């Protein structure tokens, strides 16, 4: 899947210590490709959800200590499995991301801020929490602050992309 993204990730990843970069790249690749499955292209919803379920099966295989046997996904999930094992990353955070991306496939509007906040809890906050795990810095205070930052960045992204999202039939502003 080839989609251009206007993100700062390539530059930001250079600011990470070299020992963390492979794990950061694996997390990013997982999140970026799963989000693209949900949001990009013209595949029907049933196909998008099936691909996201392939990601769920791969995560389950990682939890069981097994290799994922899909040759197309094996490189991504082999790298992710190494990062999960090396840093003790909670697989549930990756599931939260997949739940949010699956929600993107069918949900186009949010009734209120509480509903939108719940979406941010699953679509943005897991990334900050995973980074805190990499740095072994997941104190309650850090987790709370990370969640605030990640939710804020997600909301800013929604406001920046209002026109693009409206063209796709999605409205994130309650």
Regions found by a protein language model. Give the residues of each.
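Acidic catalytic motifs of isoprenoid enzymes
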Residues: 1-174
